[in-house]
UniProtKB/Swiss-Prot annotation:
<feature type="short sequence motif" description="'HIGH' region">
    <location>
        <begin position="8"/>
        <end position="18"/>
    </location>
</feature>
<dbReference type="GO" id="GO:0005524">
    <property type="term" value="F:ATP binding"/>
</dbReference>
<feature type="short sequence motif" description="'KMSKS' region">
    <location>
        <begin position="237"/>
        <end position="241"/>
    </location>
</feature>
<dbReference type="InterPro" id="IPR000924">
    <property type="entry name" value="Glu/Gln-tRNA-synth"/>
</dbReference>
<keyword id="KW-0030">Aminoacyl-tRNA synthetase</keyword>
<dbReference type="GO" id="GO:0008270">
    <property type="term" value="F:zinc ion binding"/>
</dbReference>
<keyword id="KW-0067">ATP-binding</keyword>
<dbReference type="Pfam" id="PF19269">
    <property type="entry name" value="Anticodon_2"/>
</dbReference>
<comment type="similarity">
    <text>Belongs to the class-I aminoacyl-tRNA synthetase family. Glutamate--tRNA ligase type 1 subfamily.</text>
</comment>
<dbReference type="InterPro" id="IPR001412">
    <property type="entry name" value="aa-tRNA-synth_I_CS"/>
</dbReference>
<dbReference type="InterPro" id="IPR014729">
    <property type="entry name" value="Rossmann-like_a/b/a_fold"/>
</dbReference>
<keyword id="KW-0547">Nucleotide-binding</keyword>
<comment type="function">
    <text>Catalyzes the attachment of glutamate to tRNA(Glu) in a two-step reaction: glutamate is first activated by ATP to form Glu-AMP and then transferred to the acceptor end of tRNA(Glu).</text>
</comment>
<dbReference type="InterPro" id="IPR020058">
    <property type="entry name" value="Glu/Gln-tRNA-synth_Ib_cat-dom"/>
</dbReference>
<dbReference type="GO" id="GO:0000049">
    <property type="term" value="F:tRNA binding"/>
</dbReference>
<dbReference type="GO" id="GO:0006424">
    <property type="term" value="P:glutamyl-tRNA aminoacylation"/>
</dbReference>
<keyword id="KW-0963">Cytoplasm</keyword>
Length: 460
């Protein structure tokens, strides 16, 4: 069965680059009826954070990326790793190295003085003597010293490494017995049945070491896909200064998971000229073999555009649920659906939508001085006062309100522009809002009259 995985280290919160990798792995597995598993690579016990693990799972839940089975923790699998280290030792494919840190530092200094690449010199590779007393050895794999390691990457094509240029007998277990990253990854990927490994191309240099271990252990090699990094707008590696990188920050900033996933899937992959991809679209069209070889560029303007699209088009019930996170339950209002629908057309984020909603739900405490100076004078104040007095205290539809208002203005030889902005200022405190008639239907005539009275009192 086609099986992919996402295997983060819990040393920090999940960033957007990691989420993109997880999304690609998820899509490929789900499209092909395969399995997608989550593995936490927490062998670095000093740097692990339980908060980071919680944040990763929270981000997956928010984005709707479900994984199969239980989460696998490497820290609970040390006994398994030790079995395979013993197997390699017993078969003569790995060995104990008693070289001290002082000796290793001296070797590196001598190599650097000769302008040679620092590497282990293999002095214990074929050692048969008596081990030095009082030294806990590391375990090293017997790596090929010559020749090449080649594989076909699903994105980059044919990849070749010269063993003499990049390899030495690298460590697979430290002196305290803990296994190293590359060793754990190979054991886990093999035992978990991972058939396709999709990961960032910062892992490309690990691949020859992992291939050596796969072959030494007799495991089948998965297909590798090394995805190019995401760059900031200035061409440098994406970092905090280019915008938020922690996935859950995007939720707090008012971005929808549908928009974020759509944004991320397009950072390195495309299908024709299409920009909008629902999850069903992604599952239909995505293929990791189509991922671009070159780095992609993070563009917040594009994310804003996508987010605005989803705010406009998602069903009311869906958006109302999302808005609860921001403290507004639109279902609690008689005209909640009308209110949300009147605001969604002009909102790029849910934070903007929240602020706009609060400007309508709550009576204004202050008024935009520039708007007041521009749109309200003695004549408009009288018109507002007369308009409020002319309204009956009963709730009416936006269409009826518009008809009543137009009739009121025509009797006085006035136009809608003569009163629209003063009404808007009375309702929201500013000259910006959706249709005033939709807003009046939401708040009701009684509240409208109260807000007009409050504005006039403030201006007197």
């Amino acid at each position: 069965m086609l099986t992919t995985r996402f295997a983060p280290s819990p040393t920090g919160f999940l960033h957007v680059g990691g989420l993109r990798t997880a999304l690609y792995s998820y899509l490929y597995a789900r499209k092909n009826g395969g399995k997608f598993v989550l593995r936490i690579e927490d062998t670095d016990l000093k740097r692990n954070s339980e908060e980071a693990v919680i944040a990763i799972r929270e981000a997956f839940n928010w984005c709707g990326l479900d994984y199969d089975g239980e989460v696998t923790y490497q820290s609970k699998r040390f006994d398994i790793y030790k079995e395979y280290i013993k197997k390699l030792l017993d078969e003569g494919k790995a060995y104990k190295c008693y070289m001290t840190k002082v000796e290793l530092d001296e070797l590196r200094a001598a190599q650097e003085a000769k302008k040679e690449r620092p590497k282990y010199d293999g002095r214990y590779r074929d050692f048969t003597g008596t081990p030095p007393a009082g030294i806990e050895p590391v375990i090293r794999i017997k790596a090929p010293l010559n020749g090449t390691i080649e594989f076909k990457d699903g994105i980059k094509g044919d990849v070749k490494f010269n063993c003499a240029d990049i390899l030495d007998d690298f460590i697979i277990a430290r002196s305290d017995g803990t296994p190293t990253y590359n060793f754990c990854v190979v054991i886990d990927d093999a035992l978990m049945g991972i058939t396709h490994v999709i990961r960032g191309d910062d892992h490309l240099s690990n691949t020859p070491k992992q291939i050596i271990l796969y072959e030494a252990l007799g495991f089948n090699l998965p297909e590798f896909f090394h995805v190019a990094m995401i760059n900031g707008s200035d061409g440098s590696k994406l970092s905090k200064r280019h915008g938020a990188t922690d996935v859950m920050e995007y939720k707090s900033m008012g971005y929808l998971p549908e928009a974020l996933l759509n944004f991320l899937v397009r950072l390195g992959w495309s299908h024709g000229d299409d920009e909008i991809f629902s999850m069903s679209d992604m599952l239909k069209y995505f293929d990791p073999h189509d991922i671009n070889k070159s780095a992609s560029t993070y563009n917040l303007t594009k994310l804003d555009w996508l987010n605005a699209h989803y705010i406009k088009t998602l069903p009311y019930e869906h958006l109302a649920d999302d808005m609860k996170f921001f403290g507004i339950d639109f279902r609690a209002f008689d005209k909640g659906e009308l209110l949300l629908n009147s605001l969604r057309e002009r909102s790029k984020t849910l934070v903007e939508l929240k602020n706009s909603a609060l400007n309508i739900i709550n009576s204004p405490e202050t008024y935009d001085e520039k708007a007041v100076a521009k749109f309200i004078n003695t004549e408009s104040k009288e018109l507002l006062k007369e308009y409020a007095a002319n309204l009956e205290d009963k709730n009416i539809s936006a269409k009826d309100c518009e008809d009543i208002t137009i009739a009121f203005l025509e009797k006085r030889d006035k136009k809608l522009k003569d009163i629209a902005q003063p009404i808007r200022i009375a309702i929201t405190g500013s000259a910006v809002s959706p249709s005033i008639f939709e807003v009046i239907e939401v708040i009701g005539i009684k509240e409208l009259k109260s807000r007009i009275a409050a504005l006039l009192e403030k201006l007197d």
